[in-house]
């Protein structure tokens, strides 16, 4: 426990908050071939380099759909493909947002459904905006 004199002399140091989506903090200058701190983006565009399934951590069991994506700032990240079924393959252009998947180690990003080459989830009636699904026709 510090004395009051020690606190007056040095004070308390602030703990810097680490970003949960560090790849979103960088931009890329293609002319100089350099990365630079851009202050962060809400989403970034990228190209799928590999689309695969992986298994979650211990208590859970499933085949989670994941894509390895090279972003426009040249950083390569693993991102989760939400929803049932997808049309992604290698060289698909996708939009990536932050947001980790708790039971998949190393997956800190989500692919945005219904943007660029990614189709929305078919026959999705609830929480449609999260899965890029269009509003169903009135008659059906």
Curated annotation (Swiss-Prot):
GO terms for biological process: translation. It comes from the Bacteria. The keyword Hydrolase does not apply. Residues 125-140 have a biased composition (Basic residues). Residues 120-140 are annotated as: Disordered. The keyword Cytoplasm does not apply. InterPro entries: NA-bd_OB-fold, Ribosomal_uS12, Ribosomal_uS12_bac. Keywords: Methylation, Ribonucleoprotein, Ribosomal protein, RNA-binding, rRNA-binding, tRNA-binding. GO terms for molecular function: rRNA binding; structural constituent of ribosome; tRNA binding. The modification 3-methylthioaspartic acid is found at residue 103. One of its GO terms (cellular component) is small ribosomal subunit. Part of the 30S ribosomal subunit. Contacts proteins S8 and S17. May interact with IF1 in the 30S initiation complex. HAMAP family: Ribosomal_uS12_B (MF_00403_B). With S4 and S5 plays an important role in translational accuracy. PANTHER family: 30S RIBOSOMAL PROTEIN S12 FAMILY MEMBER (PTHR11652). Belongs to the universal ribosomal protein uS12 family. This is Small ribosomal subunit protein uS12. It comes from Desulfitobacterium hafniense (strain Y51). The lineage of its organism: Bacteria, Bacillati, Bacillota, Clostridia, Eubacteriales.
């Amino acid at each position: 426990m510090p004395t009051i004199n020690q606190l007056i002399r040095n004070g308390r140091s602030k703990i810097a908050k680490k970003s949960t989506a560090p790849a979103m903090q960088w931009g890329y200058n293609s002319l100089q071939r350099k990365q630079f701190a851009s202050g962060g983006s809400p989403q970034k565009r990228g190209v799928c380099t590999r689309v695969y399934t992986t298994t979650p951590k211990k208590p859970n069991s499933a085949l989670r759909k994941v894509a390895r994506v090279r972003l426009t700032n040249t950083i390569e990240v693993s991102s989760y493909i939400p929803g049932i079924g997808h049309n992604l393959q290698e060289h698909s252009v996708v939009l990536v947002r932050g947001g980790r998947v708790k039971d998949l180690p190393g997956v800190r990003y989500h692919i945005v459904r219904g943007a660029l080459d990614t189709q929305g989830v078919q026959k999705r009636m609830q929480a449609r905006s999260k899965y890029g699904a269009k509003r169903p026709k009135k008659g059906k």
